[in-house]
Regions:
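A short glycine-rich beta-strand->turn/loop micro-motif centered on a GG-aromatic cluster
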Residues: 102-106, 126-140
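Histidine-anchored nucleotide/phosphate-binding helix
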Residues: 19-26, 113-123
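Short phosphate-binding/catalytic loops that engage adenosine nucleotides
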Residues: 124, 155
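Active-site-proximal beta-strand/loop segments in catalytic clefts of secreted hydrolases
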Residues: 34-37, 80, 106, 133
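Conserved strand-to-helix beginnings and helix N-cap segments that scaffold or border functional pockets
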Residues: 88, 113-116, 140-144
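Short acidic-hydrophobic, aromatic-tinged amphipathic segments that line or gate anion-handling sites
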Residues: 77-78, 156-158
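Internal catalytic-core helix/loop-beta-alpha segment
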Residues: 59-110
């Protein structure tokens, strides 16, 4: 997921966009975007109660894939939670050998780590990688903590 504006946007998030554009524009494989997508009732959900910052409300600014990445959109999967539990099924549906998976985006410490853990659990023998130069966390410290946690479960950090 890449959106660097909106209520959860940051300069650190905006700074990764050129790296992500370079990566996806030259990537020879399937690119799947997962996108945080909440409804108008967000503040009445468990996440809204624990993270009371209205963000990624469907069809509002901050929910869209940023303009710089729109030319490279192949597949977008909206998910109402931190991780996309359908991601393993979606990856398998392409009929390709799911032996190498690389993730990047926002937020390292929320969505990226959740999706990395989901795909690593679903494909334990796959090479799961996260490009740290194409990720940003809520804070630099939480970004690093997430990278360290992923490394501990054999997710390769680039």
């Amino acid at each position: 997921m890449i959106c660097f504006y909106g209520s959860l946007g940051s300069a650190h998030a905006a700074a990764i966009v050129p790296n992500v554009v370079k990566k996806v524009s030259s990537f020879d494989g399937t690119v799947i975007y997962t996108r945080d997508a909440h409804g108008a009732d967000y503040m009445h959900t468990q996440e809204g109660e624990k993270l009371p910052i209205i963000h990624c409300i469907k069809d509002t600014p901050g929910w869209e894939i940023c303009d710089e990445l729109k030319p490279y959109v192949q597949t977008v999967v909206d998910n109402p939670a931190f991780g996309c539990v359908d991601l393993p099924r979606i990856l398998s549906s392409y009929g390709e050998d799911v032996s190498r998976i690389e993730l990047c985006g926002l937020c390292t410490d929320i969505c990226v780590i959740s999706n990395a853990m989901i795909v690593k659990a679903a494909f334990p023998e796959a090479q799961v990688k996260v490009d740290s130069s194409c990720c940003a966390g809520v804070t630099k410290e939480s970004h690093q903590t997430a990278l360290d946690a992923m490394k501990a479960v054999q997710i390769e950090i680039l």
